[in-house]
From Swiss-Prot:
It holds the Pfam family PNPOx_N. It catalyses: pyridoxamine 5'-phosphate + O2 + H2O = pyridoxal 5'-phosphate + H2O2 + NH4(+); pyridoxine 5'-phosphate + O2 = pyridoxal 5'-phosphate + H2O2. GO terms for biological process: pyridoxine biosynthetic process. Binds 1 FMN per subunit. The keyword Magnesium does not apply. This is Pyridoxine/pyridoxamine 5'-phosphate oxidase. SUPFAM superfamilies: FMN-binding split barrel (SSF50475). Homodimer. Keywords: Flavoprotein, FMN, Oxidoreductase, Pyridoxine biosynthesis. The keyword Metal-binding does not apply. Coiled coil: none annotated.
Length: 216
């Protein structure tokens, strides 16, 4: 909270408020990149954290915080166990929403779109870059299923460490990457007295985006 108090001062919010108005990009990815780089270059505690909302085939929503691992004009990438709750829901209903909330900058980005699986090559590349402990844990975690005894998990990790001793850890087939391909991206900047600035980008055709300002 100390960092938030330093950065989210009224004076700073005013500067960011007018910066958004006068430096609006035609392409939402360019604006996201600008905002994201500013966050990465600041003492923000969790710059890559984003809320991921999914929905089951029965239209029951769920949400959780995951970490952004890659982004480009193709979309926003994260990795997970395909057998987890979110993995199953994205397989059944490949649509999702994301929310970035950077409280230090009094900014929020909302994203809605379709979801696709990354190919094995890209997923393998990222998996190989992970810490050894994280690779082993990925093998041993039956994500979202009931764990009756923590020692069972610890024991599975020890066995897997022996199995992969002095060898490269391969990626389990159930560990996958998803890419959220945006149809809508909304940027929100806090303003004084709740006079917030909101701009919504909607994909209309090909790579063309329609930009609309919304009431706060």
């Amino acid at each position: 909270m100390a960092v938030a108090l330093i950065f989210a001062t009224r004076a700073r919010i005013k500067i960011l408020f007018f910066d958004m108005i006068f430096s609006l990009e035609k392409d939402p990815f360019d604006l996201f990149s600008k905002w994201y780089k500013a966050v990465l270059n600041s003492p923000c505690e969790q710059p890559t954290a984003m809320t991921l909302a999914t929905c089951s085939k029965d239209c029951i929503p769920s949400a959780r915080v995951v970490l952004l691992k890659e982004y480009s004009k193709e979309g926003f990438v994260f990795f997970t166990n395909v057998n987890s709750k979110k993995g199953k829901e994205l397989t059944e209903n490949p649509k999702a929403a994301l929310v970035f909330h950077w409280i230090e900058f009094a900014r929020q980005v909302r994203i809605e779109g379709e979801v696709k699986l990354l190919n094995d090559e890209r997923t393998d590349k990222y998996f190989s870059s992970r810490a050894l402990g994280s690779q082993i844990s990925a093998w041993c975690s039956k994500q979202s299923s009931i764990l009756k005894d923590w020692q069972d998990f610890e024991q599975a990790i020890k066995l897997k460490e022996k199995e992969f001793h002095n060898t490269q850890v391969s990626r389990p087939d159930f560990w996958v990457g998803f890419c959220v391909i945006p149809k809508v991206i909304e940027f929100w900047q806090e303003g004084e007295y709740r006079k917030h600035i909101r701009f919504r980008y909607t994909l209309v055709e090909g790579s063309d985006w329609k930009v609309e300002q919304l009431y706060p």
